Amino acid sequence: MKKILLIILLSIIMINAQTPTAKSILEKIDENMVSENQVVVSKMVIHGRRRSRTIKSKSWSVGDSKNFTEYLSPAREQGTKMLKIDDNLWIYTPSTDRIIKISGHMLKQSVMGSDLSYEDMMESGELTDSYDAKVVGSGEIDERDCWIINLNGKVSDLAYQKRKIWVDKTKYVPLREELYAKSGKLLKRMDLENIVKIDGRWYPTKMIFKDMLKSG
């Protein structure tokens, strides 16, 4: 009986030793996903009911507080610019030659007709600064072993107070995120794909964003 009990205790100790803490996982995610300065050329494909369209842009970021984005194509969006400084966001549209500050309820509006809102774009910074985390299980995304982690906001100014993330156990990059309302209702889901190494960091080069409240 003592031998069996000893084996069980040793097994529990080994399992605990192999599973890092939720906080240490978040710290490694932040190391991969957050950089001091970056330049990103991106392509956003928006799938509508009747047609799809592609929007190209280029962004410059300084830390998590400053970001400037210029839309390059198509012609209708070309020259549109967005400037984010801390919690402030401004948009310039060449068709009206006006600068508009996006605030309040306007932050929930769609960006270029996509499922991404301005509020989503304002989300930045390190997860460890904004959320308390708990490992709730393991799973698989595209045959990659993942930790499943629940995040609960520890600051008030978050677009999503509750999140669930599936984190690659080898590369420490989220492969899926579910974003929830305070009530627990699922609002949006993001799948992160094509993970590549850039300057020693693992980073997703494709993100699929879906509003779960929309049908189809």
Per-region residue spans from a language model:
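Gly/Pro-enriched, hydrophobic low-complexity segments
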Residues: R98, I102, M122-S124, R144-G216
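N-terminal mature ectodomain segment of secretory-pathway/periplasmic proteins
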Residues: P20-S95
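Solvent-exposed coil/turn segments that connect beta secondary-structure elements
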Residues: V45, V62-D64, L72-P74, D87-N88, ...
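Acidic/charged, solvent-exposed loop-and-adjacent secondary-structure segments enriched in E/D, K/R, S/T
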Residues: P94-M122
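Short, conserved active-site entrance elements at the starts or edges of catalytic domains
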Residues: S114-N152
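Bacterial Sec-dependent signal peptides at the C-terminal "C-region" and cleavage site
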Residues: I12-P20
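Sec-dependent N-terminal signal peptides
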Residues: I4-I13
